[in-house]
Regions:
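N-terminal transition regions in large eukaryotic proteins
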Residues: 1-208, 223, 229, 349
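Extended, Lys/Glu/Leu-rich amphipathic alpha-helical scaffolds
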Residues: 2-3, 78, 83-84, 232, ...
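Solenoid-like repeat scaffolds
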Residues: 30-32, 326-329
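Helix N-cap / loop-to-helix initiation motif
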Residues: 35, 212, 313-317
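Residues within HEAT/ARM-like alpha-solenoid scaffolds
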Residues: 37-41, 105-108, 112, 190-197, ...
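Short amphipathic alpha-helical segments embedded in low-complexity Lys/Glu-rich regions
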Residues: 43-47, 58-64, 134, 212, ...
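Active-site-adjacent structural elements in folded domains
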Residues: 128, 178-188, 201-206, 232, ...
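Contiguous, well-ordered alpha-helical segments that form the cores/surfaces of helical PPI scaffolds
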Residues: 196-204, 216-227, 244-248, 277, ...
């Protein structure tokens, strides 16, 4: 079958001691076979976590996983105790060396992360399930679980709006059962708890940027691919591998998340402009219709681009889109083509609809065969 032929073709590309990245990119842009952990391996190569030289893989993975364990020891274990649980610092200590002041600041970041990861990819149950490989130094101690830190300060997770002279109105976001995933017992961890830790460590290591809402949607699919690898030895280290792949990807898209870089070459405004110009060139009528309705790209494509379309399609389709996006040497040229294709495929409706219906249509992209969308995108020169 065609599928078996593609699997054999990929095996041949991955066989040499030095993988030909150009060949790999060209193969993966048509989708990576969903078996044998191929996608996890190819993404590691395409995102630059692993070098094309296979003789370096074992050592790279060992070093990176060791480094990640250090991050956990430094950033997750509560101040006042070291890895073996001995008390060394006190929360009321005001000494400049006390880690408690940072600990309390961190909690603000954690509140947002906690809220976001408890709703990850709701169309599948994966993130609510227990991982086979909980992080031992964390799962065995209740205090080290990040969501436990958040629990006492739920009030602050309310939306606080300042009105005039410091009068603060609080809209409490009430927990709805369908939204928030439950935590696991001691000794166990759900996948969403692992993702929470990855994001928290990332925020700690990147204080200039910190955590921005939406990063959870970028890390989710990467973690899913690493943690559902059929190969046990890779699945066991899904957390560390995901962290470094996510970090590599974020270094390329961080401009989308940083307001001050909006005007930069890679900033989100620039990307939306590219989409508008491409649309104008490919279908003047649609472009004109949206322009007349003053339906600007930021109403819909801001989310499309920033979150790499992770919200517009079901997870299997997102993985398929990302195969091509990660294979694209210019990285986000193809992403813009997919966004353009999505609009072109809604031509009739957009030309018929009024402003309100078009906003609704583009903000809630209708179900569509992903192969249809991709072949349209590939046809855009």
């Amino acid at each position: 079958s065609l599928y078996k032929i593609r699997v054999a073709e990929l095996e041949n590309i991955l066989e040499p001691e030095i993988v030909d990245l150009k060949l790999l990119r060209s193969f993966c842009s048509n989708g990576i076979p969903d078996c044998n952990g191929f996608r996890a391996l190819c993404w590691k190569l395409l995102l630059g976590y692993l070098s094309p030289n296979k003789s370096t893989w074992t050592e790279t993975l060992r070093k990176k996983r060791e480094l990640y364990n250090q991050f956990i020891e430094e950033m997750i274990i509560p101040p006042g105790e070291n890895a073996d649980g001995k008390c060394i610092d006190h929360p009321l200590s005001e000494g400049p060396e006390s880690s408690w002041s940072t600990f309390f600041k961190d909690n603000e970041v954690l509140l947002q992360i906690d809220k976001d990861v408890r709703r990850l990819c709701p169309d599948i149950s994966f993130f609510q399930q227990a991982t086979d490989y909980p992080c031992n130094v964390v799962s065995e101690s209740r205090e080290r679980k990040l969501h436990i830190r958040v629990a006492p300060s739920t009030l602050s997770s309310a939306n606080v709006e300042r009105k005039g002279l410091g009068v603060t109105k609080i809209n409490l976001i009430t927990k709805r059962a369908t939204e928030n995933y439950e935590a696991m017992d001691e000794g166990q961890e759900a996948h969403w708890e692992v993702v929470e830790r990855i994001l928290f460590i990332y925020a700690k290591l990147n204080p200039g940027q910190g955590y921005v809402q939406g990063m959870n949607e970028i890390v989710g699919p990467i973690y899913y691919v690493m943690a559902s690898n059929p190969c046990v030895e890779y699945r066991e280290y899904a957390e560390a591998d995901c962290f470094f792949c996510f970090t590599a990807l974020m270094s390329e898209i961080r401009d989308f998340f940083i307001k001050t870089l909006d005007e930069s070459e890679g900033g989100i405004k620039m990307m939306m402009n590219k989409l508008t110009m491409l649309l104008k060139e490919k279908d003047y009528d649609i472009w004109m219709r949206l322009k007349e309705q003053e339906l600007y790209p930021q109403y819909y494509s801001f989310r499309w681009i920033t979150l790499l379309l992770s919200q517009e399609f079901p997870l299997p389709d997102v993985l398929r889109i990302w195969d091509t996006v990660f294979s694209d040497e210019k990285r986000f040229t193809f992403l813009i083509k997919v966004c353009c294709a999505m609009i072109l495929l809604l031509r009739e409706q957009i030309l018929d609809n009024d402003f309100a219906s078009n906003v609704k249509l583009l903000q809630n992209f209708p179900p569509m065969d992903i192969n249809h969308v991709l072949s349209k995108a590939f046809s855009i020169n």
